[in-house]
A protein has these predicted regions:
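Long, domain-scale non-catalytic interaction/scaffolding regions in large secretory-pathway
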Residues: 1-23, 154-505
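Extended, solvent-exposed functional surface patches
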Residues: 1-158, 164-165, 319-369
Length: 505
């Protein structure tokens, strides 16, 4: 924290491989959120399910309202959102709903509502959204809303309540409110808090703020882990969606309290899923975008690149980023607050670790990679003759130390550039119907699997390879993580391998 007229000196050392290093100075007139770290996490997330595609774009939708973006950054923001809208089309089913993975035939209730909310708000923000995509989605939502009957089973189901309330909210947002279903749900004797919140938002959007406020002040049931797991949720996700509702209800006191709470949690550095991260950034964007602008941030800094001179920086939005030139070794950075506002500063360094620095780790799951010849004999990958076909067998196992199933695991193995993957996916029907995974993503040099594991269950995934190019190569670590529960993870070590040149006659 730097008061007006104060200075700050920081000694930093270079980090990461050449060509991967980046140093940013995040300056803010509001308490730090760790915004750059959160955005980088969303934008660099390696998988491409619909939730993660939408989350990366949704978090940027209102970014220009509270973050100082240069022309290039603004161009990138717009391009990313437009690209996401185009990609979403691959996930829409004939029913109008959306699947979690492209090519899947089962719609996901929560993600269908989440995607619809993004498309509606993107359209409101001036982005071109295909009208047919929205019309099909609206019909799908209305059909599901009308298909719910208020029987005893439904009335007590947390997951069904949450999905129904989110559908009602998104339809209201789209200008197609199902008021009869809204009133029926409001009259339930017992309603879970996240569902009551989304229903209150539906009433707020349709102009009935009084009913919305009553829903939030009622004795609602607390959300459980069952509801959170089924809707990719968490406590912070639910608070973020509640902040959206209080903004819509015009309650500045509650909005301010929740915004402060979310900001504090985000600045802690704790891990949050892509969905939770996007929901928080979306809610804070809406809150901060409505606040009156204070005094602009103004400071000057000295670094190695300035060669002893001071570089002046100003931004009128609450948050700004200043790129510091890459360097090798150590350097001293001096910053002086020349403005009238208190400054919250953070230096952010990023870069890929040097080869060989990745260490094995595991929590709740075991991971290993084994190699075999085409005849099934075990093979040492340290040195493989050029030209031979062989296979990698990646094994994962639920250790059983956690008494529940892992539902959203993502496993990735990148292979050395001297090896080539033999792609049999297109001509092997069994691969596309494999019950061991929900989705497989095969690229030139890597393969990713997305699957679930029951308690104590083990699975193995086989990749056929060819030792194509002679030479020495780095074999990166394999990783497996639970995409919505980060303590569940495992990583192997990276190592050097070689492909021995084939002998010529």
């Amino acid at each position: 924290v730097l008061n007006p007229g104060s200075s700050w000196i920081e000694n930093i050392s270079s980090f990461g491989q050449n060509g991967t290093r980046q140093i940013l100075l995040e300056s803010s007139t509001i308490p730090q959120l760790g915004l750059q770290k959160r955005l980088s996490y969303l934008l660099s997330y390696p998988y491409g399910c619909l939730e993660q595609t939408v989350s990366a774009a949704f978090a940027q939708l209102y970014l220009d309202k509270w973050v100082q973006l240069n022309p290039q950054q603004e161009k990138q923001r717009i391009k990313h959102i437009q690209s996401a809208i185009q990609q979403i089309n691959r996930f829409q089913l004939p029913s109008g709903g959306f699947s979690y993975w492209p090519g899947n035939y089962q719609f996901d209730e929560w993600i269908s509502s989440y995607t619809g909310q993004f498309l509606i708000e993107a359209k409101m923000a001036g982005f071109l959204v295909p009208s047919m995509m929205l019309k099909k989605w609206e019909k799908f939502q209305i059909k599901l809303v009308k298909g719910i009957s208020l029987n005893a089973v439904w009335a007590s189901s947390e997951v069904t309540q949450m999905n129904q309330a989110y559908r009602l909210y998104t339809l209201a947002l789209s200008g197609k409110p199902e008021k009869g279903a809204m009133n029926q749900m409001r009259e339930l004797k017992s309603i879970y808090s996240p569902a009551a919140n989304r229903l209150a938002g539906a009433y707020a959007v349709t102009g009935n703020k009084e009913t919305g406020n009553r829903l939030l002040t009622g004795k609602n049931k607390k959300a459980t882990s069952i509801g959170k797991t089924a809707t990719y949720g968490s406590d912070i996700r639910d608070r973020a969606q509640m902040l959206e509702t209080y903004i819509q209800l015009g309650n500045p006191q509650k909005s301010g309290e929740l915004a402060a709470l979310l900001s504090k949690e985000f600045s802690s550095g704790n891990w949050h899923s892509t969905h939770a991260t996007a929901c928080v950034l979306l809610a804070l964007s809406k809150y901060l975008g409505e606040q009156k602008a204070g005094a602009p941030a103004a400071f000057k800094f000295q670094a190695r690149e300035t060669k002893g001179t001071w570089m002046e920086v100003q931004h009128t939005q609450p948050i700004g980023f200043t790129q510091i030139q890459d360097f090798v070794g150590k350097q001293k950075i001096r910053i002086q607050n020349t403005g009238k506002s208190k400054l919250f500063l953070q230096l952010i360094q990023s870069g890929k670790e040097s080869l060989g620095e990745v260490k094995a780790s595991a929590s709740g799951i075991e991971l290993s990679t084994h190699f075999f010849t085409a005849e099934g004999l075990e093979l040492d990958p340290a040195e493989i003759p050029q030209g031979i076909d062989f296979q990698a067998e990646i094994r994962v196992k639920h250790t059983g130390e956690n008494p529940y199933s892992y539902k959203d695991l993502g496993l990735t193995q990148v292979f050395p550039s001297g090896w080539e993957i033999i792609n049999e996916r297109m001509n092997d029907f069994s691969l596309n119907q494999n019950n061991d995974f929900d989705f497989m993503d095969l690229k030139d040099d890597q393969t990713s699997y997305f699957f679930s594991l029951a308690e104590g269950q083990a699975k193995k995934f086989t990749v056929k390879l060819n030792a194509t190019f002679s030479g020495k190569y780095y074999f990166p670590a394999a990783t497996v993580t639970d995409m919505y529960h980060v303590p569940i993870h495992a990583q192997t070590t990276g190592k050097w391998i070689s492909v021995a040149r084939a002998k010529t006659n």
